[in-house]
Amino acid sequence: MSNTSNGKANKGSKMQMQRITAKKNQHILNEILSDKLIWLAPIEEDNYREYQLNNAEIIKILGLPKGIFKGFWPSRQPQWDGIAISEKKVLYLFEAKSHLSEIQSSKSKKQELIRMRIDEVANEIAGIKPGDDCKRNLWYHNYYQIANRIVFKEKMQGLAEISTVYKKVVLVFLNFVNDTSWKDSKKMVKSSTEWEEHYLRIFKEMGVDKDSLQSRNIYIKYFDVENLV
């Protein structure tokens, strides 16, 4: 999501994420994920702040040593829409969307270090080789946000071996249905099927499929905001 400021949101996926993580609604994702989540962010007590995983406080909470990300990624990392730890020692990372165009990323030039990390994961998950510039560019640019979230999920899973807090990582792309907060009603996604078809097309272009992602604990979930209180 593009709006990364702190504070209570009044529209879009940022607002819906704040609503679904509110105490009165926390049972919803617990039921969807069959787990009990303890939210690190966004929470009202912390002014709904969103965090990068290299934040010193987050690193400490996750039981990881300082400097663990040195040389892995530039200091400006992805900022997560939601971070939670569960009673089962699972680290949950959330990327939230409430309209289709939020998935598309800019085509800005990426640093060599970023491209290298994406290449590693794209090769491992999708079998994309260095010479396949067409598919690689989709990971670098068009679907960069999806790509970098997958990269960090894999990184955090590797770090689970040394964490004292979590042993497994789950990445959730959480997509909201019937978000009427958008002034442009054309942006509103009216069914989970619409989201499903959109993701299936994207995954096909990226050279991955839903089943292979789920085998790596990467899930696409949908929720109708009309069911929030």
Where in the sequence are the language-model features?
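Aromatic-acidic/polar surface patches that form glycan- and anion
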Residues: 18-22, 72-75, 138-146
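Conserved catalytic cores of phosphodiester-cleaving nucleases, focusing on short active-site segments
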Residues: 82-84, 90-98, 149
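Short acidic/His/Gly/Ser-rich catalytic and metal-binding motifs that mark active-site loops
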Residues: 55-61, 102-106, 181-183
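Non-catalytic C-terminal interaction segments of nucleic acid-processing enzymes
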Residues: 147-229
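A structured, charge-rich N-terminal accessory region that forms the first stable segment of a protein
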Residues: 1-62
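Active-site metal-binding core of divalent-cation-utilizing nuclease and nuclease-like domains
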Residues: 53-87
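Catalytic cores of nucleic-acid endonucleases
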Residues: 98-175
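Extracellular structured ligand-interaction cores
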Residues: 77-81, 89-93, 141-143, 168
